[in-house]
Amino acid sequence: MNSSCKSRVFNIISIIMVSMLILSLGAFANNNKAKADSHSKQLEINVKSDKVPQKVKDLAQQQFAGYAKALDKQSNAKTGKYELGEAFKIYKFNGEEDNSYYYPVIKDGKIVYTLTLSPKNKDDLNKSKEDMNYSVKISNFIAKDLDQIKDKNSNITVLTDEKGFYFEEDGKVRLVKATPLPGNVKEKESAKTVSAKLKQELKNTVTPTKVEENEAIQEDQVQYENTLKNFKIREQQFDNSWCAGFSMAALLNATKNTDTYNAHDIMRTLYPEVSEQDLPNCATFPNQMIEYGKSQGRDIHYQEGVPSYEQVDQLTKDNVGIMILAQSVSQNPNDPHLGHALAVVGNAKINDQEKLIYWNPWDTELSIQDADSSLLHLSFNRDYNWYGSMIGY
């Protein structure tokens, strides 16, 4: 090939390479712009401080994907690629904050769960945030509400009082989750306002950072799951005191593989003389729980404390239902939910750590938390101590 041909070929190759470089730079710029636009529209949640104890960060990043995958499996949802948003806090209207950290769990671009890190046992309630032992829990708590405004460039504060949970945005307060109380008002708009002190203390979080998990690691995180084969959520507690009725109905439906039990019918059986108007205020006592179970052909017995992981595993394999009995840590005598009952659905091993799966009648989905934690941080910002169990449903 003569020198003029070589020069012509070299020039053509150079032009092609420069063109490809320009195109790739353009694509990179467009991609970055798209990412920037996406981030600019993301939800921001106000917090007093974005400082989070390192042990909380580590636990959240280590555990969230396995927890999400395990909960997806329970609802027969397709697993996906899980990401973790930034931690946020929940405040009372006077500015007090609770003792937990909350993370949005994102799957395929949607907020699907909330990961909660809260004190592990009663003794931890008196420790500093840095010295506290934390329990990890996952549920759908306010996840759908957050997802609805995730891409609307919203800036909110998450608030709570005895009536439920609220989002405050641009001075307007909106109720998103109402506490299950008899006669509770369910209006979505609220005249409440954030205290001046809290407004002064709040600052905006940075754009939520998504921590991407390696796909191979996600596959290995859930080593084992064991649940009551026929457990289904058919109803939800709201404006009544029937937590034990809901729990017994769900467990008996599961272990008998039927759909004939419901909370209202159980409470009506226990209180045949009470009017329909007064029935929502009726609670259930341990002797009633035992007697009702026996009337349905079940040998129910009370066991103090939290059952061991091995016991839950075996009882679940044997198709035997366990009802959690819990007491509010606050011990407020005016609290209509001073005591609470929940249903154990099964157990799991995630990241080689033992977990329990349970249903809180206040919720529409299951929750998963550490098997060695006796403290239950439930949907309405309440800490309950798991003091005993009714076994045999």
Curated annotation (Swiss-Prot):
EC number: 3.4.22.-
Main location: secreted
Keyword vocabulary terms for this entry: Hydrolase, Protease, Secreted, Signal, Thiol protease, Virulence, Zymogen
Active site residues of this protein: C243, H340, N360
Any one GO CC term of the record: extracellular region
Propeptide, chain numbering: 37-219
GO BP field: proteolysis
Regulation: Prematurely activated/folded staphopain B is inhibited by staphostatin B (SspC), which is probably required to protect staphylococcal cytoplasmic proteins from degradation by SspB.
Subcellular location: Secreted
Enzyme class: hydrolase
Molecular-function GO term, any one: cysteine-type peptidase activity
Maturation and modification: Proteolytically cleaved by staphylococcal serine protease (SspA).
SUPFAM superfamilies: Cystatin/monellin, Cysteine proteinases
Record-marked site positions (Cleavage): E219, D220
Note: The cascade of activation of extracellular proteases proceeds from the metalloprotease aureolysin (aur), through SspA to SspB.
Similarity comment text for this entry: Belongs to the peptidase C47 family.
Description of how the protein assembles with itself and partners: In the cytoplasm, prematurely activated/folded SspB forms a stable non-covalent complex with SspC.
Protein name in UniProt: Staphopain B
